[in-house]
Amino acid sequence: MNQNFSSMIDRYKHQQLRIGSVSPQQISAWTNKILPNGEIVGEVTKPYTFHYKTNKPEKDGLFCERIFGPIKSGICACGNYRVIGDEKEEPKFCEQCGVEFVDSRIRRYQMGYIKLACPVTHVWYLKRLPSYIANLLDKPLKQLEGLVYCDFSFARPIAKKPTFLRLRGSFEYEIQSWKYSIPLFFTTQGFDTFRNREISTGAGAIRELLADLDLRIILDYSSLEWKELGEEGPTGNEWEDRKVGRRKDFLVRRVELAKHFIRTNIEPEWMVLCLLPVLPPELRPIIQIDGGKLMSSDINELYRRVIYRNNTLTDLLTTSRSTPGELVMCQEKLVQEAVDTLLDNGIRGQPMRDGHNKVYKSFSDVIEGKEGRFRETMLGKRVDYSGRSVIVVGPSLSLHRCGLPREIAIELFQTFVIRGLIRQHLASNIGVAKSKIREKEPIVWGILQEVMRGHPILLNRAPTLHRLGIQAFQPILVEGRAICLHPLVRKGFNADFDGDQMAVHVPLSLEAQAEARLLMFSHMNLLSPAIGDPISVPTQDMLMGLYVLTSGNRRGICANRYNPFNCRNFQNEKIDANANKDKYIKEPFFCNSYDAIGAYRQKRINLESPLWLRWQLDQGLIASREAPIEGHFGSLGTYHEIYGHYLIVRSIKKKILSIYIRTTVGHIYLYREIEEAIQGFCQACSDGT
C-alpha cells in the first residue's frame, strides 16, 4: 500500500478492501517512488538489514531508508534534520544519502520489491485446493508441479518454425533421458538459445500457457462440453458415471473461475510473479530486547533467503558464461522454493525451521487463523456497547427473548438510562445520574426496564460461520451473571450450555435497530438458510424432558394397568385381583386441569401419578362396540364404566353424567403449552388479516 492508496482510503472513507491478484505494473506503481533528483528507488537488492557497527539500515537492504522512508521523522541517514511541511525552497531530501525528509509513519505502508531473475508461480494459486492454475489450464496438478519445479520440460507449442523436438516426434512432455541430457551439452548462452526455441520449463512455461488463454473461449468450450455430458445420460457403469460426474463438477468450477477473472479484469498470467513485493518494515520489525539482543520477524529471514538465491541466479545468468544449464534450472527451482516458503511455509512438505527447530512463520501463518492479522487485529478488537458472558438455558423464556444480567445491562444501556433520568427530572446533570446508577437506586432499574423494552440486542457466538451465528433478541433483566437463552435457538448458534460464551452488542442507529427487528429476530429465523430444513427443533434434554413428562409410570410407557395388550399386567391382575380391585377408586379425580396442577404444586401427587380428569369429550368419539374393562357401582347410585383411557359416570337410568380421562400432570402441562401456542398462532393470524 503506497501513500496515494492510503490517502485515497482516508479521503473517501472506504470501509472495505479487496484481496486479489495484481499486475506487475501495479506492483511497480505501488513500490517505486521518484526522488526529487529524478532517481527511481524501490528495488531491494541486498539481503542485509542493519549494519552491525553503526546499527543503521543497510542501503538497498530490507530496511533501507531510501526505499521505505526515515526511521525518525525529518531525520535522514546522515543525521541531518528538516522541519516536515516547511515550505521553504530547500531540498526535500538529503543529497548525500538520498533519504526524504518525511514522516516516519511512511514506513508502515511504503513497500519495496524484489525483481526476480526468473518467473515464479504463486503457490496459493498452484497448490491450494482447488488449484486455480490447474483448473484454467485443464491439466493435472501433478504434471504442473513437475513443470514448475523443473522436473521435466515442455515442448514449446507456440514456435512458428519446426523445432528439433517436434521433428523428433516429441509431443508434450519429454522423456527422462532428455531431461538430463539436454542441459549438460550447452553453456548458459547456448542453453538459453536452445530453450527459447525448443523447450520451456519452470514457471515461465506456466506463464506462457496462461498468457495464451482466451477466457471467452474457455467459457464457450466448457459450457458446450458440460451440455454434451449432460445429454449422454447414465451409462450403467458406476465407474464411468462417477468419472463423468467429476468432470462435470470440474467444468462448473472452471466456468465460474473464468467468469470471475473476466468480471474483475484480472489476467491469468498475473498468478505468476515477476516482481515480488516487500512488506513495509514496520509490519516485519526488528526490535531490541533486554541485554542488547535483537528479535526479528520470521518474514525478514524468509526475504533474505529469497534475495540470496535470486542474486545467485542473476550472477549465473549474467556473469558466469560457462555454467551448465542444469545448474541454472536447479537454481531457478531454489528460487521458486524460497518464494513458496515465504508465502506459505510447509505447503510442499516439511516446513523450514530455524536453528532452534522452530518453524518460520510465513505470510499465510501471519494472516490466517484465530491469531492471524484479520481475525485478531482487524476483526477481533473490542468495540463499544458490547459485553460477553457465559450462556445458560432459560426454559421459561419466549423464543425471541433472552435474559441479560443486571451488571451487563446497566453498563450497555447506561447512556440511555442517564438520558431517561435527566428527562424525567430525576437527575439534574450527568454526574448526578451516574451517582444514582453507581448506588443502584430502585428508580434506575425501572428506567432500565423501560429502555430495554423498546431496544433489541444482538447475540453473537464465535465463530460466525453463517448468518444464524448472530441473532437479535428482546432482552429482559435476570439475576446472576450468565446470559439466559432459549434452548431452541441453540442449534443456530451451534452452542452448548457447557460453558460456551456469547457476545452482546447494542444496535445504536435506527437503521441497525430496524434491521434487527425485521431480519434478525430469532423467531423469524426458524429455517436453515442452507437447506431450508427447520433449525429450531427440540433436541437432547428437551426430548428427554418430553419423554419423562409424558411417559406416565416410571416402569415404562407400556406399564398401564388398563392396557389390555400388556400381558404382564394382565397376569398380575389375575393373581392380585382382590388387592387391586378398588385401585382406580384410590386414583384422584379432578374437575379441571387447574385443580390437578395445584395438587401437584402442593406435592399431593407426583408428575407421573395417574389421575382422572373431567373432560368435555364428544360422545360421538366413544366407540359403541367398545366394551368396558371394569364396572363399579357408587354409593350414590352412580355407575362407573372403566374403558382403556377414559371413564364414564352414568346415572341409574344409564344417562351419562360426566366423562373422565385417565392422564398425568405431565400430559396436562404439555397439552396446555400446545393449546397456548395454537391460540397465539391463531390470534397472530387474525391480527395479520
Curated annotation (Swiss-Prot):
It is found in: Plastid, Chloroplast. It is an enzyme of class 2 (transferase). Its main location: plastid. It comes from Populus trichocarpa (Western balsam poplar). Mg(2+) binds at residues 496, 498, 500. It catalyses: RNA(n) + a ribonucleoside 5'-triphosphate = RNA(n+1) + diphosphate. Zn(2+) binds at residues 76, 78, 94, 97. GO terms for cellular component: chloroplast; DNA-directed RNA polymerase complex; mitochondrion. This is DNA-directed RNA polymerase subunit beta'. GO terms for biological process: DNA-templated transcription. Its cofactor is Mg(2+); Zn(2+). Its EC number is 2.7.7.6. SMART domains: RPOLA_N. HAMAP family: RNApol_bact_RpoC1. PANTHER family: DNA-DIRECTED RNA POLYMERASE (PTHR19376), DNA-DIRECTED RNA POLYMERASE SUBUNIT BETA (PTHR19376:SF54). The keyword Metal-binding applies. SUPFAM superfamilies: beta and beta-prime subunits of DNA dependent RNA-polymerase (SSF64484). In plastids the minimal PEP RNA polymerase catalytic core is composed of four subunits: alpha, beta, beta', and beta''. When a (nuclear-encoded) sigma factor is associated with the core the holoenzyme is formed, which can initiate transcription. DNA-dependent RNA polymerase catalyzes the transcription of DNA into RNA using the four ribonucleoside triphosphates as substrates. The gene is rpoC1. It comes from the Eukaryota. Belongs to the RNA polymerase beta' chain family. RpoC1 subfamily.
